[in-house]
Amino acid sequence: SLVGSEMCIRDSRFGVRQKEVLRKIRAEVDVLTLTATPIPRTLSMSLEGIRDFSVIATAPERRLAVKTFVTSEQDGTIREAVLRELKRGGQVYYLHNEVNTIENTRARLETLVPEARIAVAHGQMRERELEHVMRDFYQQRFNVLLCSTIIETGIDVPSANTIIIERADKFGLAQLHQLRGRVGRSHHQAYAYLLTPPDGAFTKDAQKRLDAIQALEDLG
């Protein structure tokens, strides 16, 4: 059969060469690109009228904006954020993006929040093991998922409505936007905590990114 259309989800994950390879499969193929964070080339072509584009600005019914906090990393803040979610029967993503120290962070969280049932997920795990952990988290056998950025895409857990991101100053604006989008996928109020070093040792550019993601929390 002939290819008549192509759908590209998450434009930012595909480079120009990759897209051209897909288009060469069939010259007259129709291309539909879906993205919340378009790459500059795609955005520019749309704004200049080279490509048609539509904006979906209406949030799903009963969806609430994620409340976003930028704060220095403190044990008290972490415990309060986790417990608030657990007390309403919800789940938490705790993002620690250094696999070699993730078990140390697990031990710290177990001491800090002994009430939590913690699972670990990262990209260096065997595929079957990772699938098992994610399935158990979805089924609420665990209420805190200590993870890497592996959760950035393809994860939809409506009962997970708090995300805590360590060293948020190290992430780009688009990535922070994607990570924050893992929560707030139901009618419950969701929270995102972007943690920075307690000593304030991060760049001015990082501060600008954090200020921007905190300011741009409205839906649509």
Which role fits each region the language model picked out?
Residues 1, 5-6, 10-211:
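Inter-lobe coupling/hinge segments of SF2-like helicase ATPases
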Residues 215-220:
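C-terminal or mid-to-C-terminal helical accessory/interaction module adjacent to the motor/catalytic core
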